[in-house]
Amino acid sequence: MQVEAHLQKIIDQEGKVHLTLIDPASQTPERAAEIALAAVKGGTDAIMIGGSTGASGTLLDETVIKIKEKVDVPTILFPGSSAGLSRYADAVFFMSLLNSRDLGYVITNQVMGAPLVYQSQIEPISMAYLIVEPGGTVGWVGDAKLIPRKKPELAAVYALAGKYLGMHYTYLEAGSGADKPINPEMIGAVKKVLGENKLIVGGGIRDAEAAKLCASAGADMIVTGTVLEEVRDVTAKVAELVSAIKR
């Protein structure tokens, strides 16, 4: 499966993509697979697997394997470092945290991880990763110089730099469990400069209203993760979010 082409096809046909983020450190591999299956029943298009801390090694491998046993949508690694790679996934967001002060998150982890991606033939999807206030755990771990919420022009120039460096996707991240999502003004400003390049938005998207607001502002893909760990009916919550963004 060519994952990037698959996601593009969904955008062409349905307008937007919904991605479910599962952190292997938050539950057992078996429970992760149950969440993934419930999300797929709700209409999610792919499963992202990763987290800021603890998502590596045997736990990561077992989580990917269990999820793939349950669902047939793409599994995409969302690594916090080079340790967050698994040869069992379909693809990886091969990303650079452009607004990190730590070169490790800008390029060193990528250099260390590239051989495994090459050898295992996981599909790399190039991505500029940008962390916006409040940033959450990922902002702290990644030593990010957070982009202020009220400075959409800063996010836009970072995104433009990523585009000119050849990155296909840009991800605006407010941080897992953020109290509110990226504001529409910033999403719109970034999408304007990206043009046909794809914009992912995540963090703080907890209901249909927030999802629709982000999608309408210009997000091509919406990510939800934390809220799915908190609700009893994952299928219903995902269906609510998906129906808000798809045409």
From Swiss-Prot:
Question: Which prosthetic group or cofactor does it need?
Answer: Mg(2+)
Chemical reaction(s) catalysed: sn-glycerol 1-phosphate + (2E,6E,10E)-geranylgeranyl diphosphate = sn-3-O-(geranylgeranyl)glycerol 1-phosphate + diphosphate
Coiled-coil spans are none
Q: Name one GO cellular component term.
A: cytoplasm
Q: Where in the cell is it found?
A: Cytoplasm
Q: Name one Pfam family in it.
A: PcrB
First-tier enzyme category under EC: transferase
Enumerate the InterPro entries for this protein. Answer: GGGP/HepGP_synthase_sf, GGGP_HepGP_synthase, GGGP_synth, IGPS_HisA/HisF
Where is sn-glycerol 1-phosphate bound in this sequence? Y171, L172, E173, A174, G175, S176, G177, G203, G204, G225, T226
One MF term in the entry's GO annotations = magnesium ion binding
Q: Which GO terms describe its biological process?
A: glycerophospholipid biosynthetic process
What EC number(s) is this enzyme filed under? Answer: 2.5.1.41
Where along this sequence does the record place binding of Mg(2+)?
Answer: D23, S52
Q: Which UniProt keywords apply?
A: Cytoplasm, Lipid biosynthesis, Lipid metabolism, Magnesium, Metal-binding, Phospholipid biosynthesis, Phospholipid metabolism, Transferase
TM stretches of this protein = none
Purpose of the protein: Prenyltransferase that catalyzes the transfer of the geranylgeranyl moiety of geranylgeranyl diphosphate (GGPP) to the C3 hydroxyl of sn-glycerol-1-phosphate (G1P). This reaction is the first ether-bond-formation step in the biosynthesis of archaeal membrane lipids.
Which NCBIfam families does the record cross-reference, listed alphabetically?
Answer: GGGP, GGGP-family, PRK04169.1-2
Q: Which family does it belong to?
A: Belongs to the GGGP/HepGP synthase family. Group II subfamily.
- Name used for this protein in its record: Geranylgeranylglyceryl phosphate synthase
